[in-house]
Each structure stands twice: as C-alpha cells, then as structure tokens.
Amino acid sequence: MAPANLPSIFNATSQDIEQLLAAQCHIGSKNLGVHAQPYLWKTRADGVNIINIGKTWEKIVLAARIIAAIDNPSDVCVISARPYGQRAVLKFAAHTGAQAIAGRFTPGSFTNYITRSFKEPRLIVVTDPRTDAQAIKEASYVNIPVIALCDTDSPTEYVDVAIPTNNKGRHSIGLVWWMLAREVLRLRGTIYNREAPWDVMVDLYFYRDPEAEAEEKVEEEKLPGVDEEGVAAIESGFPAAGGDWEAAPAAFPAAGAATGEWSEAQGAQWETGTGAPAADWAAEPAKESSW
C-alpha cells in the first residue's frame, strides 16, 4: 500500500504504515459514499469498508504542503467539535502556531464581524465534516478552503481536501493530527532531518478522559502507607517527630513552697467579712424624677 504519486522524499516509512494500522486508521464504516470509493481498499465480510492507507498518507502530505504554503501560521484555523479531537487540535495549534477552536463552534465566527470570536483565516482544518458542519458552511460563504478528516460515510460537500481515515476513534484521530503536524514542521524546516524521529510523543495527541486523569492525580497525591495496615503504616506514613513519647513529664514546682499553703488566708479569711460592707439598697429613699 505504498503511495506511488509522491516524490520519493515524501514516501511513508514502514513505521508510519505500522502506526496507521495500529491506530486503526484503515477501519471505515459500513456505509460508503460515492466520493469515498477511490479511497476504498476492500469490504470485509461483515460489511465494514477498509480504507487504503497509501491514499491516507498521500492526503496527509498534500494537506501538510497546503498548510506550510501559508506564510502566517496563525491564518490556519483547526477545529474540532468532537471530544476525541479537541486535545489533538490544541496540541497541533501549540506546535504549528495555528488557531484552535476546541469544542462548540460559535455560529458567525467567520461571517459576523461584530462577534468577539470573529476570525478571518485563510484555511481551516476540521476533524469531522458532520460535527463541524457549521464551520464548513460558513467557510463556504467567505471562500475559505477546507481540509477535513473524512470517513467512508462523511459528507464531502464544500470540502476541498479530504483525508480518508477513521475519524471516530481516539487513537486514529490523534495519530493523523500528529502526523500532519510533523509533516508541516518538516516542510517548514523546523525538523531538519526526515529520518530522525520527532521528539514529541504521539500520546500527547490522544484523548484522555478527565475522570481518569482526576483519579490518577488522587492516587499520586496519596501519602505513603495510607493503604497499609498495622505498625508498618504508622512507621512509613507517620514518621516520629523526634521526641520521646515515653519520657516522663516535668514536675510542676510545689506551690506551697513559694506562696504558702492554700488553706492559709493571706490577711483575713473572706468568710469573716473583713472586706468592705455591702451597701443597703433598701435603706436609701428613691429619688423622685423631675419628669
């Protein structure tokens, strides 16, 4: 399945083909659109269409050459309303300098200049033509070219360059975006040697469940020995503070030696009434008010 319509410098390596197969980029859907027939390899017995990986690589290189031809990287807008592609477009934008719209696309972002999210890109790249239909529709109004990751059943209306791949799996979406970013950087000269591997791992482009990340963070923040039992948990999780717990406390000084016995009265006993006599409130006549 090696591509034959590219210069030899752009040919895919065996590792690239293995990665595309491992990420199941060749697994299409059971429905087949008329525009996806040239990219079909075969149809399995269960009705699932298999995509030609060689055609996928050709379109990845073609899309990368189009993106690299734009002088200002920020004039490229990458869009993904599908959750599996949101992390990928953010990483692609961080590595190539493009603008990213991850999540819901605000209607009017390309046509209504009054909105805060108004943009005027020269090229947009979408993850799924079906979920990103609003962005493609607005791009057609203002003559913006569209590159899209298309499955065998994806609509291709107003799509200028379709990359045939599985756009429903988290690994296939992340791998295609990773390869697209790598080819763009190679064409720009950021990666000088095409034989050397890119130092960015493809795992960074894969979707990660926020709940799973939160659970991993909680596990990392746990103190050592919390889940253990017995003396070992106390020794490992609660180290000694440095003092001796069995040491006897210091004795308080005898109060009688310094101040005398408590039973002895200093001066006179308070029971004898030596203090000032209490005034008799009843003996005093009530003062008449002038009111």
Curated annotation (Swiss-Prot):
Gene3D superfamilies: Glucose-6-phosphate isomerase like protein, domain 1
Stretches assigned to coiled coil: none
Primary residence: cytoplasm
Positions of region (Disordered): 255-291
Gene Ontology CC terms: cytosolic small ribosomal subunit
Subcellular location: Cytoplasm
GO MF terms held by the record: structural constituent of ribosome
UniProt record, GO biological process: ribosomal small subunit assembly; translation
Paired cysteines (S-S): none
InterPro entries on file: Ribosomal_uS2 (IPR001865), Ribosomal_uS2_CS (IPR018130), Ribosomal_uS2_euk (IPR027498), Ribosomal_uS2_euk/arc (IPR005707), Ribosomal_uS2_flav_dom_sf (IPR023591)
Keyword entries, A-Z: Cytoplasm, Ribonucleoprotein, Ribosomal protein
HAMAP family: Ribosomal_S2_euk
Subunit: Component of the small ribosomal subunit. Mature ribosomes consist of a small (40S) and a large (60S) subunit. The 40S subunit contains about 33 different proteins and 1 molecule of RNA (18S). The 60S subunit contains about 49 different proteins and 3 molecules of RNA (25S, 5.8S and 5S). Interacts with RPS21.
Protein role: Required for the assembly and/or stability of the 40S ribosomal subunit. Required for the processing of the 20S rRNA-precursor to mature 18S rRNA in a late step of the maturation of 40S ribosomal subunits.
UniProt record similarity statement: Belongs to the universal ribosomal protein uS2 family.
Protein name: Small ribosomal subunit protein uS2
Species whose genome carries this gene: Podospora anserina (strain S / ATCC MYA-4624 / DSM 980 / FGSC 10383) (Pleurage anserina)
Lineage: Eukaryota, Fungi, Dikarya, Ascomycota, Pezizomycotina
